[in-house]
Amino acid sequence: MKNIAIIGASGYTGAQITSLIHADAGLSVQGLYVSENSLDKGRELSELYPLYSHLPYVLNPLSDDVKAKIVAESDAVVLATEHSVSLELAAWFYQQGLAVFDLSGAYRFADVAQYPKWYGFEHTHPDVLAEAVYGLAEWNAAEIAKTRMIAVPGCYPTASLTALKPLKSLLTSAYPVINAVSGVTGAGRKAHLHTSFCEVSLTPYGVLGHRHQPEIATQLGQEVIFTPHLGNFKRGILATITVQLQPGTTEEQVKQAYEVYDNSPLVTVKHNAFPKVDDVVHTPNCHLGWKYDANSGYLVVASAIDNLMKGAASQGLQCIKIHFNL
């Protein structure tokens, strides 16, 4: 039994991964934690989320004494915190010997020069960053098992990379074009006018400037055009991706490329059939569907995931189970 502390548990992702860890026979929840300044400190998680009325956990303030208690009682810590908060907490817990599963973007780029541009801070822990592994579970399992610093991927990158990585050797130099729509839970739990019930509407955002674009490009090894959209639904992501394949590529080669997922139970691949968000919401699954026009050389692949599950919490759980061989 591995004990897992969860910091930032009051948010959607933190609450979701709490429920998953609680339900796993090989894991136990050491405790839930929020900032000492949080309005939610001292409250039960079920007060915030009646859906989780079966979870008997209080949101404790994260003091220095509490951090020491976490180190003494835990095998790992999950960080569902702001990027700048994870930057410091991840390094501290890693240096104390715990395994760290960071759901923020603070350790996703190996290159420290990326952080000022995309996250607005200088990376102050390059030594810990050098140990970090990108936690794309179906692709990096061997590395996840070896390191104690796992940067769980973003939601859009998970959907996009799961679709694109099998095709890498077949791509031309043309940029893949990714159009993706996410439910409003992707914007977090804090209230904002543009995500309120009466205001939310399907619209693109972060055009040619979203931080997930370089994350996708870095992990794919090729530049991409990425346009995210806000959808008027609660959860889920659908990414529709258009790519150009090398001249002479056959449909059979594409089928063979996607056979990489034959032993990946959470990834389903269909030819000439396309996924929908409703089929993956509240699941850890990724559904892919593709169609190829050999005459033009263009392939369209669609990828559907739950942004809070495969795009965050359940992939975090995958990484935990891979790391601890559970």
Swiss-Prot record:
The active site is at residue 155. The keyword 4Fe-4S does not apply. It is found in: Cytoplasm. One of its GO terms (cellular component) is cytoplasm. Pathway: Amino-acid biosynthesis; L-arginine biosynthesis; N(2)-acetyl-L-ornithine from L-glutamate: step 3/4. It comes from the Bacteria. SMART domains: Semialdhyde_dh. Keywords: Amino-acid biosynthesis, Arginine biosynthesis, Cytoplasm, NADP, Oxidoreductase. Its main location: cytoplasm. PANTHER family: N-ACETYL-GAMMA-GLUTAMYL-PHOSPHATE REDUCTASE, CHLOROPLASTIC-RELATED, N-ACETYL-GAMMA-GLUTAMYL-PHOSPHATE REDUCTASE, CHLOROPLASTIC-RELATED-RELATED. This is N-acetyl-gamma-glutamyl-phosphate reductase. It comes from Shewanella denitrificans (strain OS217 / ATCC BAA-1090 / DSM 15013).
